[in-house]
Amino acid sequence: MTVRFSPFSPSDASGRAGASRAPSRPAAVGRAAALAAAGLVLLLLGLVVVRLPWAGDLGMHAATLQRLRHSPLAPGNPLVDADTPSPYYSPWMVLLGGLARVTGLDVFDVLRLAAAAGLLLLVTGVWRYVRTLSANPAAPALALLSLLLLWGTTPFLWSGFPGLHSLALTAAYPSTLTLGLAFHFWAWLARALRGAAGWGAWTALGVLWAVILLCHQFSGIVASAGAVATVVAARAARVVWPRVAVASAVGVVALWAWPYYDFFALFGAAGDGLEPVHRALYGQPAARYGLVLPGVAALVARWRRDRRDPLAVFFLLGVVIVGAGWLSGHYSWGRALPAVVIPAQLALALAVVGAGRRWVRAGWAVLLGGALVAGGWAQSGALGYVVPKDALPGVVADRYRAPWKGYGWITPWVGYGDVVMARGRAARQVPAYGGYTVAPGYPDFFLPDEARRAAVTEAYFGARTPQAVRRGAEREYGVRWVVDRGGGLLGDPGLRVVARGPEGLVLYAVR
C-alpha cells in the first residue's frame, strides 16, 4: 500500500531534523521553561480536581450518575420522575455509574475521578497529536499551554472550551474526556493513514468516533471536523478509502445501536430551543477569542506552504460550521468554535519550533510568549479555586468566579427518588443528591410534557396562587418537599418548615 503522507508538515521539517542534533542552549532553556510552565498549569488543575468547584452543569452530571448507580439498565430521566431517555447517558457516564454502583463511592468522588481521567486523556492526547505534526520535543508543551491560555482577555467559561478557567469548572464534564479522546483519535487516524493499518484498527477507529459523538455531541462535531482535515491532509492512496468507508459505517452502526438514547433523534428533537442560550457564543469575539489571532496568521503561513495542511483545513471547516450557524440563526452550531480556535492555537505553538530563519522563529516566539502572558493573566481567577480568595491580590480576586453552594443540607430529609418542587438554581442542584424535581432544571427535548411541568412549577410559586392549586400539583407529581428562597410560602398551611439553608433557602415538607 502506498500512502503519500508525512506526519510532519513542511513547516516543521527542520524540527524533525534538529531532533537528532544536540539542542542549542537557548532552545534547551526554552524547552525547559515550556515544560515547567505546563507542569505548573497542570498542577493547578490537579488541585482544582480535589476541590471540584460547582458552577454550572456539575449537578446535571451528578444526577446522571445517581440514576445509573441505582438503575443501570433503566435509569429513566435524570432530573424528573419520568421514564424517558436522555443524551446524558453516554458510554462514559454508564461506565462511571457502574463504578459508583460497585464501589459505593459518592457521586461527587466519582466525578473527581472523572475529572482526573479527563485531564489525563486531554494532556496525553495533545502530546500524541502534536507529535504527528512536529518532532521538536518542545512542541507538545507549547501546544498544551496554547490550548489552555490562548483564548481572550476575558475568561469564557463553557463546556468543550478548554481554557484554563473553563477547565477548572468543567474538568469533570464529559466534554473534557471527549476532547481528550478527540486528540487521541486524530493521532491514531493520522498514523493509520500513513501506515499499513489493518481492518481491525479501522474498525476500532469507527467505534472510537461513535463513542466520542455519544459522550458529548458538540465536541463530537469538533472531532469529526478534525478527522476530515486529517484525511484530506493525508493524500492517501485509493486502497485506503475503503477502510475509511468501513470505519465510518462501523461508527454509524454503533451510534444507531446505542441503547440509552436515539442519537439521530437529537437532530430534530431540539428545534429552536437551544438557540437563545447559545447566541452568547458569538458575542464579544475580540474579548473572548482575540489572543488566537496570531495563530490565524501562523495558519495562513502554513496554508501558503501546503494547501492541504491539516491544521489549516481543520480551521477552515470550523469557520464554515460556525459561520453557517451565525448566518442561519442556528447559534448552537457555535459550539464548534473549538474547531476554529484549536488549530490556530496549535499553529502558533508549532511556528515557534518550525522551519525558517532563526529571526522568524524568534518573532513567533515573542508573539506566543506575549499572548500566553496575556492569557494567563486573563484566566488568573482560576487560582481562587485552590487559594483562599482573601489571599489573592485584589485584581486577581476580581477575576475569580465563586462556585455555587451545594444542597447537601437537604439530604437528612430528602431521600433518593423523592420529588421536590424547586425552581431556578435549586432545580439544577437538587437532583445531584438523588431527588427529582417537577420541572427539569435544564432543557429536555425527550420529555414530552416539559412545557406543562414548567408552567405548573411557575404557578406553584406564584404569590397569588390558591392553596387548592398547590395541593393539586403536589398530588399530581407526588411532591414531598419544596425548596424556596425567602418567606414567600411561609403562610401556606399545607407546608411545614423543616430546615433552613444558606442564602435564605428554606426546605418545606408537604403535610
Predicted regions and their residues:
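Extracytoplasmic
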Residues: 4-7, 224, 380-511
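Short hydrophobic alpha-helices at membrane interfaces in multi-pass membrane enzymes
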Residues: 189-210
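Hydrophobic/aromatic-rich transmembrane helices and adjacent perimembrane loops
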Residues: 222, 330-365
